[in-house]
Each structure stands twice: as C-alpha cells, then as structure tokens.
Amino acid sequence: MLEFMDYVQLAFAEATRWNQDNSYSALTATAESLLDFHVPERLQVRLSSLSTPHFATSYTLGTVGLIDGSVSYLFSTVPLNNTPSQSGLIPLRRLVRGYRQIEAPVPPRRNWGWDAIPSPNSLQNIDGAENNDDVVRKATLLHATLHLPPPSTLNALFLRRISPTTQITASLVSTQAPPLVKSAPSAALLAQISHDTGTFSNEYLFSTDNALFGWRGLWNIGLEPAPGKASTDKVSLLSAGAEAYYSPISSLVGLSTGLKFTTLPAASRTPSSSSSGSTPNPISSFPYTLTLTLTPLTGSLSTTYSARASPNLAFSSRFGFNVYSWESEMVAGCEIWRKSPRTEPVEVDDGLEWARRKMGIVKDLAAEKISSLSSSNNPQAIEEDEGDSVIKIRVDQSWNVRLLWEGRVKSLLVTAGVSLGPGSFTALSSIPSSPTSSSAPVAAAGTGSSQSSGGGAAPTSRPSYWQGVGVSILYSS
C-alpha cells in the first residue's frame, strides 16, 4: 500500500497531468506490483493529514524491539482541492498498486496550466484558444522526511515543472554520523531532468555519490498522437527502452535494455449492440502485459507476463535466467479483490471546506472541470471506487511464500502480511553449529526479514517455518 505522502505526490502528478507510466523506470511496474510487494515486518502506525489543499503532514511510529518513527511534511503550489484525504474516503485501488491498465501517452497541451497554477480568470479557457496569461507560478512540490531515532536520516525532494514537456527533480539523502564519530553528516544528491513528448521519454541523471551519470530512454513505437488528444482506437502499445550509467571515479558501468507490449483499453472494450457488423477484436478480450529485459554486462535475462482475467482478479509471472552462472528464477503471484455492495452517498465531505473558505478558494464548476480533466487520464477512474479489500499471494521456485491482506476497517486502512518458506530448514541442516548463519538464506530469498529462526535456540532445536509477520495501520484526515 502506498504511503500517504506517495499518494499526495501521485495526486500532484495527476493535477499537473504528468504521465508517470511513460518512463523506462516503469517498464516492469505491473509485474513488480504483483510480485515484489512488501510484507510488513512489525507493528507500524501512521497518522497523516492533508490540512490544507497545499500542505500535508505525516507521522509514523513503529516497533521491532526498538521504537522508531518519522516525521514528513509536503508543500505543493498546486491546490489539491479534489483529492480525497480521509482514510475512510480514499479509494483503495489508488493506494494499492496492482495491475496497471495504462492508456496511450498523450503529448501535453500549451493552452492549460501544465506547469503552473491557472488564474481564476482563465479557468473558463481550459478548452479554448491559447492563453499565455494564466501563469502565476511554476508547479512546485517540496517534501522532507526525518527518520528517528539517531542516527537520524533526512530525505528531501524538490520537484518543479519548467515546461510542458520537462520536469526537474532533486533528491537529497543525509545521514547523521554516529555519536562517537566527530564528522559532518554524509549526504548524497541526485538530480534528474525528465523530458516527455508522448512518443519519446528521456531522463538524465547525476548523483554526487561517485559522480554517477545516467540516462534512461523510452520509445513508444508507432505512436504519433495529437497534442492533448488520446488515441482511443489503438488496441496495443509496443515500447522499447534502455538505460546506461557510468561513474568516472569508480569506473562503474551499467547497461540494460527492454521491451514492453501491453494492451490498451480499446482492446477490451465490448462492442455496442448497434455495431452488429463489427469484427471481433484480434488482440484479446482481457488486458495483459508482456516485458523482456536484458542486462548484457551481467548476462541477466528476465521476462514477465501479467494479465487481468477479471476486474477483481489478476495474475503475473516472471522468469529470470543468467547466461553466465546458469542460475534461474521463477516467481508467480496473483491478487484478488473483494467488493461489497454499498449505496452511493449523496454528497461526500472531505473536511477541507473550511480551509478553502479561509484561503478564498471557491469550489466552482471550473475547478470540477480541471479535476475531470486530470482524472480522465487515469485508466482506473471508473473502477477505483470498487474494492474494499485485496489479497496478494506470491510464491517462487524455492517455495518461499508471501501473503498480504490490505483493506479498510471502519476508518482505518490496515495492511497485514506474513512471509514463510523452507529456507531456514536448509540453513540449519547444512551448518548446525552456527545459528546466526540461518539469516543469510532468508535475506537472500527476498522475504525482507533479517530475523534468524534459530538465533536464540540450541543447534538441535527445530527451527520455525515463519520468516516475517507484521501489521501496518494508516489513518488520515
């Protein structure tokens, strides 16, 4: 489940109509959402609030032997007036990342506040001719998170839209030095420039850590849409991309390439009864996504296949192979949504009306029109209100299993999961005299738990089959 601050950043991207799916970093996002989901390892409580349309806060408290937590603040120059912030009103499908039914990328238009907040006098010209006087200030987002207790870590993010097709991002990570070490806190800065034209997407990166330079690119083959208009008749999309990294200090070189084939909403659209002479769709009646990634330097090859058999059921599988070591990996998973019948509320109060009145913001028809424009680019806008809970299951070739349940309990968003597998049995049987060595295979299995099952027991005791279990609770207002 997305954290509240990630949810607000997603709302910011939708408000400014920046397509996060049109990037090489999101090439395998569908398979990763279904196969690489995180299982909580402890009890964690989050309290979040979108106190004003421009400002959000979040507090986290967790325990795993030691009590730790974090404090987060976020500021956006774009008013998030129509973003649900109460945990009882946020659609669960917007927080849980599952199968992603994407739409054909659309180039940005210049006659809307793509990179700025439109002035009130220009809201009526959303669909009209070009208006260059609606720019008040650039769309900017500031986010900072402080992780406690010491050694504390500070994460900061600066995001700014500088043109219809360009966005800059700067991320900072600073860690406090240990108490006995008298030195300045270590810090690393990552700067990124993203350029998206719909057909092409390029990202240029630089990190102060080892002076790392990077580039990521994605090309949507055969896609030439008009600015501001989506291709509603296109049934599939083929994308090719690559990334490259180089560090002159450490002589580090990285290279990967990939392909993705995915169906678009037109492929699963049911023909109307009036069009009796229409031919059946040659692609498929259900959405699916295929990806192929190759890392030539390490010899790694990976393929994924994800399909949504129904609106409440999705499957995914991944097969990886290394041509140098002859090692292979096979993972399969699925997600099952459950929805209960409920009556549609007449009017929903998000609790921010007092803030709008104080800031002089009127929730008029033009503001609702902007909201409909940004939500029209979301392929899950129709079904995002459906679903009260979801179960995710993941199993690999070593029979390491992850089980996750995410749902709504009253006004709380709850995540509960467990990871288990036979890795601990093999570890203790091979090296019975070293109880701490059993944690290495567990961590290598990717279950996310570093606790050893036999760390405090005698070598002759039978280890536990459990590898990790936890619960996370979120409340937002």
Curated annotation (Swiss-Prot):
Any one of the GO BP annotations: phospholipid transport
Topology with respect to the bilayer: Multi-pass membrane protein
InterPro entries tied to this protein: Mdm10
Pfam assignment, any one: MDM10
Subcellular location as annotated: Mitochondrion outer membrane
Low complexity compositional bias, start-end: 430-452
Key words, A-Z: Membrane, Mitochondrion, Mitochondrion outer membrane, Transmembrane, Transmembrane beta strand
GO CC terms of this entry: ERMES complex; SAM complex
Region (Disordered): 430-465
Subunit structure: Component of the ER-mitochondria encounter structure (ERMES) or MDM complex, composed of mmm1, mdm10, mdm12 and mdm34. Associates with the mitochondrial outer membrane sorting assembly machinery SAM(core) complex.
Protein family membership: Belongs to the MDM10 family.
Notes on the domains: Lacks alpha-helical transmembrane segments, suggesting that it resides in the membrane via beta-sheet conformations similar to those predicted for other outer membrane proteins and porin.
Protein role: Component of the ERMES/MDM complex, which serves as a molecular tether to connect the endoplasmic reticulum and mitochondria. Components of this complex are involved in the control of mitochondrial shape and protein biogenesis and may function in phospholipid exchange. mdm10 is involved in the late assembly steps of the general translocase of the mitochondrial outer membrane (TOM complex). Functions in the tom40-specific route of the assembly of outer membrane beta-barrel proteins, including the association of tom40 with the receptor tom22 and small TOM proteins.
Record-given protein name: Mitochondrial distribution and morphology protein 10
Organism: Talaromyces marneffei (strain ATCC 18224 / CBS 334.59 / QM 7333)
Lineage summary: Eukaryota, Fungi, Dikarya, Ascomycota, Pezizomycotina
